[in-house]
Amino acid sequence: MKKLKPLFAILTAALILFSAVCFLYPAISNAINEQYNESRIDDYNNNVDSISQEDIDDYFSAAEKYNKALATDVSTDDSKLSILSHYDEILDLDDGVMGYVEIPSINVRLPIYHGESEDVLTKGAAHLEHTSFPIGGESTHVCISAHCGYPTQKFFDDIDELENGDEIYIYVLDRTLKYTVTGTDVVEPDDSSKLEVVQGKDLLTLVTCTPYGVNSHRLLVHAERAPFEAATSDSAATVSQVTRTVPKSHQLQIIIAGLAVIAVVIVKV
């Protein structure tokens, strides 16, 4: 009987530890994916730092042409169709990321990818094709979509908590764009009337599924461009640092340390 006690203790500890891992799986998975997103954003910033100002200007020029073509009323113009057909090449630094979005009030920081494929939506935020590229300017309407209720990571789960006046930051190349929330809408999935360009306006809309777990409609969070002084790489880093109550790069280490403590306590008991 005494020989069984150590085995019983080990099995009990293993069972409790396994239960703890299952309970913490969403947090662990989220921390891993957030760390991956941080590395993608770091890689993007390093890529931007490595290219010349001339190349940066060329990237913006191509995006501006796309946005102007998108804002024109003639949908069958050959030159417009030609420009729009090069969507995947615009703001493409060969790493798949065109920039990143940051929402301080709900602690969101995600890379932005081209298009709304399922592969993209499992990694970060998606820029909706046939909407303006996120470079700012009059008569532009940027639309960025992300999952809600995804099992392995939080994306736009909390954008329903955003209030008028909350700030959203978009980082593209060497530009930092600041938008403030102006309102929300709930629409049918095929209703794009709220995503159209408004002449003279510089707009941003965040898109996700709603209600949570049902996903029968789309939640739209609208925002409008606001002044942001000294939008340099240094100021962008400062904004990024203050948005996170716990740095995402440390979340996984905290969880692992917690599991280790649980295991030690159980084994000693």
Where are these regions (language model features)?
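Solvent-exposed, non-transmembrane regions of membrane-associated and secreted proteins
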Residues: 4-250
